[in-house]
């Protein structure tokens, strides 16, 4: 865990060696009927605030998912660095349900206590092809359950997601995702090394105005492994 944070610190410190550039700051607020994530429904109607700070090829984002009924909240951080058609991310996810009986401690990262999960992400999206592929691996916060009820080693649960898409206009994108669980992880209750867990069709359109944009989105998701499906829609504002 310490090595992970040291690596993040090194990346942040590297900003000082970059050529003088302006910081880019942006924000958005969206609301969706359901929070659909990697073949599962995390909560119902919710709001998603997001703040993004960019400098050169570095981007730091903070965003959350807060359900209207107060049952679910999630606070996420994502630090990314872009090189050509690749981007590399370190992310931290913090999620809690109101039904949790343990006291909340945002600053705990101990096994069996933390509600944080850290993830390493690699994305490839060629500019000349309507295709993208992303690899996600939990590096801390997700452990393999043992037969005696204790937690074992880190699961390194991974998720592979290819995407093909069509741009009707620069503001209209239709995407088809196929997500797979790689290695035993929570996506399959730690029972399968491989499973298709997410088939999603998503359409997203932006309405442009002088100083802001309004995103509109509709998604249909199927989880072949769980034999479940959901439909969701959302709207927001970007500034």
Residues covered by each model-derived region:
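Cleavable N-terminal export/targeting peptides
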Residues: 1-24
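Outer-membrane beta-barrel initiation region
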Residues: 21-54
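Short loop/turn motifs that connect adjacent beta-strands in outer-membrane beta-barrel proteins
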Residues: 21-24, 89, 128-130, 166-174, ...
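Residues that define the transmembrane beta-barrel architecture of outer-membrane proteins
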Residues: 23-25, 43-47, 71-75, 114-120, ...
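Transmembrane beta-strand segments that form the barrel wall of outer-membrane beta-barrel proteins
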Residues: 28-35, 57-68, 88-96, 103-105, ...
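Detector for outer-membrane/organellar transmembrane beta-barrel domains
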Residues: 108-185
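Outer membrane beta-barrel transmembrane domains
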Residues: 175-209
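Outer-membrane beta-barrel "beta-signal"
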Residues: 201, 205-207, 227-239
């Amino acid at each position: 865990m310490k090595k992970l944070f040291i690596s993040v610190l090194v990346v942040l410190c590297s900003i000082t060696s970059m050529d003088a550039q302006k910081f880019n700051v942006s924000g958005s607020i969206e609301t969706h009927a359901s929070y659909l994530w990697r073949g599962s429904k995390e909560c119902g109607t919710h709001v998603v605030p997001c703040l993004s700070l960019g400098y050169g090829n570095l981007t730091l984002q903070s965003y959350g998912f807060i359900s209207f009924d107060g049952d679910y909240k999630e606070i996420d951080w994502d630090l990314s660095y872009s090189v050509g058609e690749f981007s590399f991310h370190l992310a931290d996810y913090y999620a809690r349900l109101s039904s949790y009986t343990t006291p909340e401690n945002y600053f705990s990262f101990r096994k069996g206590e933390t509600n944080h999960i850290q993830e390493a992400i690699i994305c490839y999206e060629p500019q000349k092809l309507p295709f993208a592929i992303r690899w996600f691996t939990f590096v801390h916060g997700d452990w393999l359950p043992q037969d005696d009820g204790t937690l074992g080693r880190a699961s390194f649960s991974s998720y592979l997601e290819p995407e093909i898409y069509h741009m009707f206009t620069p503001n209209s994108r239709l995407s088809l995702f196929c997500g797979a669980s790689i290695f035993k992880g929570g996506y399959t209750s730690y029972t399968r090394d491989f499973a298709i867990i997410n088939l999603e069709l998503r359409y997203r359109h932006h309405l442009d105005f002088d100083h802001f944009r309004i995103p509109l989105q509709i998604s249909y998701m199927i989880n072949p492994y769980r034999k479940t499906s959901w439909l969701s829609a959302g709207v927001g504002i970007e500034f």
